[in-house]
Each structure stands twice: as structure tokens, then as C-alpha cells.
Design a protein with these regions (language model features):
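C-terminal segments that line or cap access tunnels to active or ligand-binding sites in enzymes
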Residues: 331-434
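A glycine-rich dinucleotide-binding beta-alpha-beta segment and adjacent secondary-structure elements
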Residues: 190-205, 361, 417-477
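N-terminal glycine-rich phosphate/pyrophosphate-binding loop and immediately adjacent elements
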Residues: 3-141
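A conserved beta-strand/loop element that lines the FAD pocket in flavoprotein oxidoreductases
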Residues: 246-259
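A conserved FAD-binding loop/helix module that cradles the flavin
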Residues: 58, 473-496
Length: 499
């Protein structure tokens, strides 16, 4: 079949699904995207309240720099990259009982001076991480396929290897915890806590468990020549541009359409679609199906057809992260002067209190960035929480109220929050995320970047079922709009090669 005769169904209009769909449509395939939400973008979409625009989950973007993954893909699609400003510092991290933050500066030298001041004796570790990062980054920029599942995948992986990549191989099974011990820093509480806070944002797990090779990249992506970006308008512009590209190239994006089943019937693949507007259901069929869903949802979609070993592996995964998020619309007076765009707060050190201390990751809008009316701002604060808490039968509204009040109290130690400055308050729980994104139990950020689930040991885009593909943060290289865009590009290359 020529491309124009081949049909591809994409399940999920997250950034991974939309990117795959846009690239496939541009390359001549017939593409249709189904998503249950009203607004595209998944965890990188937005909602509006009283003149405020809130980014739902993702608030910063990597890969917009020249040669970055979004830049490469948008060039191929022949669409304009959205306007954005650098996040500098990428994050201001407040450790317990400290009034001055650790600023993760974009400038490499400035960041080096900052970490030498904050963490004396740790420079050998940072230099080691930076060396691993550059080797890994050069490798990733050659588009390897991880983990490989057939000869062609393995050949793409081999072609991406160079002599300088080999130096990273001995560390494939190492964690950041191992590196801290190796450099004699295992008992540096401030450093370990800082790494825990930063890594949890990207890897979903703490320093002790995070795969070293993944961490090297996660910890270096904030600095030049890369960097984290704050999109002008809102996160929604990313999805909007991708949808324009899909529709320009003849593809369709159908929102409020839920896919509940994938069936393999010989060469053709079928998916069961339900229109949430008309409640009609039907089966649509295609040559390929690309599932932009979590691996947990993927197994549910396959039902009885899921290979036993695959389903068992998913069942045995450690529970993924879930988040509780508070969205505040405030007067600018609530924001301290020179407030950085992203902050982290940790209420106490683990050993100092009886329960697990709460940490918040906070994003603050800039004046004139399109997220709030003049003289006003948005504050979005998220914390990791356990799914068990939210699905354990406790009074849901009561729990939501308790979490909201606690988060606002913690934020009030830095921001000026009171009845005069707070205009709008809203919260999202794991159940909210599940309802709007369809992600099983509202999980965020993928399967967690432990050694057992990252890179070579992760879930492949090429699934055990022929021409049924997995894309998104359950696959290499993991979470974030840049991560899922790499995942999408991999799937598109694999589909092209197989067809």
C-alpha cells in the first residue's frame, strides 16, 4: 500500500500523539486522532477561569533551542515555533528553614559558582555528571531506538553509538545514590535533598533510585546551549500549532471521542470509538494504531489480547506518581519582587518529622505572558501524593479541602496570600486528572526512571503486537513535551520503515 492509502489511528491527543499524527500526516498518511477530552494537549493543556489561563500540568518546555527536538519537528512540519522566553533560573529551590534559594541558573558558569557555594566538595560529582550528559546527549541526538525490538531497531541503535558513548556503558546499572556514595557525598543531606527534589520532577523517583544516565540529562537540560522555556500565551499554543499542521495535511482530530478497545483482526486493526456527545459507538479500522496512552491504559485497551508476559510486567510495576495541584488566580501584590518563574519548597527534612514532608513545585506567570489580566498573576503549585490516599474511600471533598488549605498555607510563607490578594482558587486531584486525561488513576510523568524501567530496560514503542505502537511518557526517553516528541519521532520512523 502506498502511504496515501494507509490509514493510521492515533489514540490520545497529548503532545506525543499530536506530534506523531502531525509527522505522519506530513509524510502522506491518512491520519485520525481520537481523544476523550474537550481540549487537546493532555497533561500539557489549559483551562480558563475569570480571565486567568491555567496550564493544567506541564508548565515549562525543553527542546525549543536550535537543533532541539521541538525545533527539528516544527521545521519538518514547516510551522512556526511558539514564542517563548528562557526560564532563568530554571528553578529556585528552597530547602527547609532557608530563606535564600538554590538558583539553577541557565548560564553554565553561573550555575557552577552557585553549586560550589551551596554544596562545597561536590564539584567532582557535577563534573562527572556533566561528562555523562554530553556523551548521552550526543548519542540521543543521533536518534537511537531504545529498547530495540527487532533487527532494524537494533541497527538504528548501533548507528547512534560512538567511541565516546562506550564510556557511559559501565554506568547503565548505576543510580544517583551509587554516584553519591562513589564521590563520598552520601551523607551530604542538603545535596541529597536538592537532588531528590529536582529529580522527582523528571524521573518520578528520588536520587537513591533514579538511573544515573537519565539523571545526568535531567540535571543538565536547564543550562545553555539547551534550557527550559516559558511559552507566551500558555502551554496550549503547542497543541494548537500541531493540530493546525495535522488539519493542513488532511488529518482529523476528533475530541470528545473515547477509545475503549483495540482489536487485532488480521492485517487491519480495529478500535472501538464512543462519541461522548452523541453516545454513539462504532468500530474504526486502520493499518496501524498509535496509542498515546500510559502503558497501564494500553494493557486495558488490549484486554484479552494483551500478551501475558507484557501484562504481567505492567501489573508488577511500582505505583506511578500522582499529583495534587492548586491553581490560584491572584493580584500581582501577592507575588514578591523578582520572583523566579519556577520554585520548589520543602517543608522539612525527612528525618526531622514523623510523616513524609510535603514539597511543592510552583509556576508563576509573568506580567504580559497571556496567562492573567493586567496587574494579576497565576500561581500553580503541585505536589506528589499517593494514589491510595485518593482512592481509599476517605471523604473526597474533605480530602480535597484539606490538601488545598495545606498547600496555600505552605505557599503563604513566600507569597502574600490573603482574602485581598486571592481572586480564584481551584484544585485538581488524581481523580481530576483521570477524568480529563483518561490516564489510569490520574498518573503523571510515566513509569519512573529507575534502572529497571529507563532506556534499554524500558517499554518499547514497538509493542509485541504488529503495527500497534506505544507513544508517550511510558516510553524512551520519558516525560516532558520534549521526551514524548522524541518518542513520537521514533514511532513515525518505525512505521515508515515497516510500511
Amino acid at each position: 500500500l502506498s502511504k496515501s492509502k494507509q490509514k493510521i489511528i492515533v489514540i490520545g491527543a497529548g503532545i506525543g500523539g499530536l506530534t506523531a499524527a502531525a509527522l505522519l500526516a506530513k509524510r502522506g498518511y491518512e491520519v485520525v486522532v481520537y481523544d476523550l477530552a474537550l481540549v487537546a494537549g493532555g497533561c500539557a493543556s489549559t483551562f480558563k477561569r475569570r480571565g486567568f489561563t491555567f496550564d493544567v500540568g506541564a508548565t515549562q518546555v525543553a527542546g525549543l533551542e536550535s537543533g532541539g527536538i521541538h525545533d527539528r519537528i516544527f521545521k519538518e512540519l514547516e510551522i512556526e515555533l511558539p514564542e517563548a522566553t528562557y526560564c532563568d533560573p530554571a528553578c529556585a529551590v528552597f530547602l527547609p528553614n532557608e530563606s535564600e534559594p538554590i538558583n539553577v541558573w541557565r548560564d553554565r558558569h553561573k550555575w557552577k559558582l552557585e553549586r560550589q557555594k551551596q554544596f562545597p566538595n561536590s564539584e567532582p560529582l557535577w563534573n562527572f555528571l556533566e561528562d555523562l550528559f554530553w556523551r548521552s546527549w550526543r548519542f540521543q541526538s543521533r536518534d537511537p531506538i531504545l529498547p530495540p525490538r527487532n533487527f532494524w531497531d537494533a541497527w538504528q541503535l548501533i548507528k547512534a553509538l560512538r567511541v565516546d558513548t562506550l564510556a557511559t556503558v559501565p554506568y547503565t546499572f548505576s543510580t544517583v545514590g551509587d554516584a553519591l556514595r562513589g564521590f563520598g557525598l552520601a551523607n551530604d543531606h542538603r545535596l541529597r535533598t536538592f537532588l531528590d527534589l529536582q529529580l522527582k520532577l523528571y524521573s518520578q523517583v528520588n536520587a537513591e533510585e533514579t538511573a544515573l544516565l537519565y539523571a545526568a540529562t535531567a540535571l543538565a537540560v536547564s543550562q545553555t546551549p539547551l534550557g527550559l522555556f516559558h511559552l507566551k500565551g500558555s502551554m496550549q499554543v503547542l497543541s494548537d500549532r500541531l493540530i493546525e499542521s495535522i488539519e493542513r495535511d488532511g488529518g482529523k482530530v476528533l475530541m470528545q471521542h473515547r477509545v475503549s478497545e483495540i482489536k487485532e483482526t488480521g492485517k487491519r486493526k480495529k478500535v472501538k470509538v464512543e462519541s461522548l456527545r452523541t453516545v454513539e459507538t462504532w468500530w474504526d479500522e486502520a493499518d496501524h494504531v498509535v496509542a498515546n496512552v500510559t502503558v497501564n491504559n494500553f494493557v486495558q485497551l488490549l484486554g484479552e489480547q494483551a500478551p501475558k508476559g507484557y501484562a504481567k510486567r505492567v501489573k508488577n510495576l511500582k505505583p506511578a506518581s500522582v499529583a495534587f495541584v492548586v491553581y490560584l488566580g491572584v493580584n500581582r501584590a501577592a507575588i514578591p519582587e523578582n520572583c523566579p518563574p519556577h520554585l520548589q519548597f520543602l517543608e522539612a527534612y525527612e528525618h526531622s518529622i514523623a510523616y513524609k514532608p510535603h514539597s511543592l513545585f510552583v509556576s508563576v506567570s509573568k506580567e504580559g505572558d497571556g496567562r492573567a489580566p493586567d496587574g494579576k498573576a497565576t500561581i500553580i503549585a503541585s505536589e506528589f501524593t499517593d494514589a491510595e490516599v485518593w482512592y481509599g474511600g476517605e471523604d473526597y471533598q474533605e480530602l480535597k479541602k484539606k490538601f488545598t488549605e495545606r498547600a496555600i498555607a505552605q505557599l503563604s510563607e513566600y507569597f502574600h496570600l490573603n482574602e485581598e490578594t486571592i481572586i480564584h482558587v481551584e484544585a485538581a486531584t488524581p481523580q481530576t486528572f483521570e477524568r480529563y486525561t483518561g490516564r489510569d488513576r490520574g498518573i503523571v510523568g510515566g513509569v519512573g526512571m529507575r534502572v529497571s524501567t529507563f532506556g534499554p530496560f524500558g517499554f518499547a514503542n514497538r509493542t509485541p503486537l504488529k503495527n500497534i505502537w506505544l507513544v508517550g511518557d511510558s516510553t524512551h526517553p520519558g516525560e516532558g513535551t520534549a521526551g514524548v516528541s522524541y518518542s513520537a519521532l521514533t514511532v513515525v520512523r518505525q512505521i515508515e520503515q515497516s510500511s
